[in-house]
Amino acid sequence: QGDSNDLASLKTAFAGSHIIFAVTNFFEPFAKLFDGPKTAEIEKQQGINIAQAAAVTDSLEHFIWSTLPNSHAVSGGKFSVPHFDGKASVDDYIREKEPALLAKTTFLWVTWYHTNYSFPVYTPFKVPTAFADVHVQLGSWSPETPISTIGDVRLNLGKFVRAAVEQPEKAANGAYVLAAVETITVEGLLKLWGETHGKKTKYVKIDPEAFRELWPVLAEELGVMMDYWDATREKSWSDVSGRKVLTKEDLGIQGLQTLEEGLKDLAAKTATA
């Protein structure tokens, strides 16, 4: 069993592997440190450990690194989303230090999960004293902010990984793949949540400082991500070097569950919980 903090254990775990799918968990150390930048440094080192171990795995044919765009670079230095930029630093390491591994690498951008509605900062709630029977979602960003989403990651992610592995001529050599089923606005997503959950909804934009006071630390981490998406819009899932980002259409991926179907399943599970 490999430990992303232990290079030697990773080398042992990877021995004999032909395909490696690597993902780190930013929010595990974040829950202990409550510090985004410090957690990003931990995640960066974990990713470098994984890359170094993969690079010396002689049997390796394809390396898939689950990463995210460099928000600091894309936004021209205006934003830095820790759980994005720590991962993106590993991309830079692979490109600069591991050329042989780069030839076998797909950089996979996994977008917003539909289960993120379970995060307190996203969860719509009923206002007990309100006359209207609506569920409210609070946020400090525009309701027109676009959210690219993979929907149900458990059902859809594997199709992107398989497509990348089966088409290395497109997806290897350091190519970026965007794992998204659709893009929808914040307001549109909330409306769809309401329709699938049988609730009336309303998005209420509030002051950024007030938003962060309601959910300290977590709102800072996720709030800066939403602000980044709001500011950069269609550029948010792009590479500053101009490299093409492959989509589901580019890879011919079919049979993906739609976001609406995923939210219906989520509503059914919530109702029976």
Describe the function of each predicted region.
Residues 5-8, 26-42, 57-61, 69-200, ...:
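Oxidoreductase cofactor-interface core, primarily capturing Rossmann-like NAD(P)-dependent enzymes
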Residues 20, 157, 189, 259-262:
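Non-catalytic, hydrophobic alpha-helical segments
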Residues 1, 201-210:
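A generic structural motif
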Residues 1-19:
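Conserved Rossmann-fold cofactor-binding substructure of NAD(P)-dependent oxidoreductases
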Residues 19-22, 65:
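Redox-cofactor binding/interface segments in oxidoreductases and associated redox assembly factors
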Residues 46-49, 53:
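Short, conserved SAM-binding segment of the class I
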